């Protein structure tokens, strides 16, 4: 089980300056030394490098685009197999109701339970309906990761209306809820923990210096 506390997302896509499994392992080490209780990471290669560097539970994902589908976070059994090989403690996958490129969500959950019975599963959702569906399927954790990042939730931010969407999710499911997406300040982190989430994933506000720099620059341009 993931501990209560701060999970730091250590990810850099191929077009980003810090794209490197070695760099992500050092980012994870910095997060560990700062008090993080877990890491969220993308790709088998990054996860293996991170697990060689820090003794923290890892939420693993594989981001891969597929034609004719907007689902890209651990979309098929191919990505699941890569994550099983990485020996991450938790596999996270897109649990939205969008069209998937291959297996159904139900089939993927069954696949993970069969092939990796000791690995926990996290649902990345965008709506309360999707959270309820994930709970029905028996996900161990339900994360607000994709709220604001789907075509039908675009423009919505997790912290709007004092985290009302997060409150709605917490009231709708019995599973452990993870706050993720637009938790961008220590005060926001404290607020979501006070609301009763199991843990919170923070990424860009900690591990994406390019984006952090842009925020400083843009404040003078606005």
Curated annotation (Swiss-Prot):
The enzyme's E.C. designation: 5.1.3.9
Top EC category: isomerase
Keyword Isomerase attributed: yes
Keyword annotations: Carbohydrate metabolism, Isomerase
A GO biological-process term: N-acetylneuraminate catabolic process
The keyword Hydrolase is assigned to this record: no
Annotated Gene Ontology cellular component terms: cytosol
Gene Ontology MF annotations: N-acylglucosamine-6-phosphate 2-epimerase activity
PANTHER family according to UniProt: N-ACETYLMANNOSAMINE-6-PHOSPHATE 2-EPIMERASE-RELATED
Its job: Converts N-acetylmannosamine-6-phosphate (ManNAc-6-P) to N-acetylglucosamine-6-phosphate (GlcNAc-6-P).
Protein name in the entry: Putative N-acetylmannosamine-6-phosphate 2-epimerase
Species for this entry: Staphylococcus aureus (strain NCTC 8325 / PS 47)
Highest classification ranks of the organism: Bacteria, Bacillati, Bacillota, Bacilli, Bacillales
Gene assigned in the entry: nanE
């Amino acid at each position: 089980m993931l501990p209560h506390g701060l999970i730091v997302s250590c990810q850099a896509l191929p077009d980003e300056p810090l794209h490197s499994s070695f760099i992500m392992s050092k980012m994870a080490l910095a997060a560990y030394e700062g008090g993080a209780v877990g890491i969220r990471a993308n790709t088998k290669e990054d996860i293996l490098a991170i697990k060689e560097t820090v003794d923290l539970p890892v939420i693993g994902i594989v981001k891969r685009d597929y034609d004719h589908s907007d689902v890209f976070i651990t979309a098929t059994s191919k990505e699941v197999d890569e994550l099983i090989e990485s020996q991450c403690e938790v596999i996270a996958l897109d649990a939205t109701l969008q069209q998937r490129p291959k297996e159904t969500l139900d089939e993927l959950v069954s696949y993970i339970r069969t092939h990796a019975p000791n690995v926990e599963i996290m649902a990345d959702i965008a709506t309360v309906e999707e959270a309820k569906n994930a709970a029905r399927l028996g996900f161990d954790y339900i994360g607000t990761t994709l709220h604001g990042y789907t075509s039908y939730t675009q423009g919505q931010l997790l912290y709007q209306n004092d985290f009302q969407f997060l409150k709605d999710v917490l009231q709708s499911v019995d599973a452990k809820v993870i706050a993720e997406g637009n938790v961008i300040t220590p005060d926001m982190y404290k607020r979501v923990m006070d609301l009763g989430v199991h843990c919170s994933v923070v990424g860009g506000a900690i591990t994406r210096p390019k984006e952090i720099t842009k925020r400083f620059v843009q404040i003078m341009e606005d």
